[in-house]
């Protein structure tokens, strides 16, 4: 049987980079990782509460965290930062202050920057949010997957694979459905592949969405 490996972890150091950049003593390492996870969850929850979008897409592609002794630098890569800024003009300052209080980082300054990504629908996280929104609104899964593929084609990607697993369309028995368009060379390390695994709660239960996007050549 083929062993499935995370495509991002498989390519670290070649075409993919780390999203957390810092050094720590081995005994403090787990604390640092947990802190990163809490920061990411806090930011996602804040954006979810304060962003009013019709599609239900928050548009966070990834959150990079760089730590120094006296500074925590957080870079939020977003597809639609304008919506967040329009709905909360002072949102970034507010988020920065709240995070500083939450993590009690008195000795360390906390700085948040937002970077817009050029082609939002070429990112698997944003695409997974889009599909999740469609499934919550009871759109047929095939229609949602086809629409997602149309959106990625506009973003000039070389290939995409979308997989949805669970009680699809409320059927009694859980199953896995997938669709592929273009090339997705998972075995080639030089091929830059972006990947995302996303969980969505629908009225029928939990569905898992996985997306692989082949961005650029081998």
Curated annotation (Swiss-Prot):
Its main location: plastid. PROSITE patterns: KH_TYPE_2 (PS50823), RIBOSOMAL_S3 (PS00548). Keywords: Chloroplast, Plastid, Ribonucleoprotein, Ribosomal protein, RNA-binding, rRNA-binding. Gene3D superfamilies: 3.30.300.20, Ribosomal protein S3, C-terminal domain. Residues 47-118 form the KH type-2 domain. It is found in: Plastid, Chloroplast. One of its GO terms (molecular function) is rRNA binding. GO terms for biological process: translation. SUPFAM superfamilies: Prokaryotic type KH domain (KH-domain type II), Ribosomal protein S3 C-terminal domain. GO terms for cellular component: chloroplast; ribonucleoprotein complex; ribosome. It holds the Pfam family Ribosomal_S3_C. It comes from the Eukaryota. InterPro entries: KH_dom-like_a/b, KH_dom_type_2, KH_sf_prok-type, Ribosomal_S3_C_sf, Ribosomal_uS3_bac-typ, Ribosomal_uS3_C, Ribosomal_uS3_CS. Part of the 30S ribosomal subunit. Belongs to the universal ribosomal protein uS3 family. This is Small ribosomal subunit protein uS3c.
């Amino acid at each position: 049987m083929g062993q499935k490996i995370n495509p991002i972890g498989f390519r670290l150091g070649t075409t993919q980079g780390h999203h957390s950049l810092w050094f720590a003593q081995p005994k403090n390492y787990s604390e640092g990782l947990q802190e990163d996870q809490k920061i990411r969850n806090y930011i996602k929850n804040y954006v979810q509460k304060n962003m009013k979008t019709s599609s239900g897409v928050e548009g966070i592609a990834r959150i990079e965290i760089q730590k120094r002794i006296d500074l925590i630098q957080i870079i939020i890569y977003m597809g639609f930062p304008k919506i967040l800024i329009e709905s909360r003009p002072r949102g970034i300052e507010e988020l920065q202050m709240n995070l500083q209080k939450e993590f009690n980082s008195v000795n360390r300054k906390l700085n948040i920057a937002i970077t817009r990504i050029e082609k939002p629908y070429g990112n698997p996280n944003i695409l997974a949010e889009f599909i999740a929104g469609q499934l919550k609104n009871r759109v047929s899964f095939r229609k949602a997957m086809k629409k997602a593929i149309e959106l990625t084609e506009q973003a000039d990607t070389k290939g995409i694979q979308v997989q949805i697993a669970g009680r699809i369309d409320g059927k009694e028995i859980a199953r896995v459905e997938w669709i592929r368009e273009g090339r997705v060379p998972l075995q080639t390390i030089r091929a830059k592949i972006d990947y995302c695994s996303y969980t969505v709660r629908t009225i029928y239960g939990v569905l898992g969405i996985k997306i692989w996007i082949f961005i650029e050549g081998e």
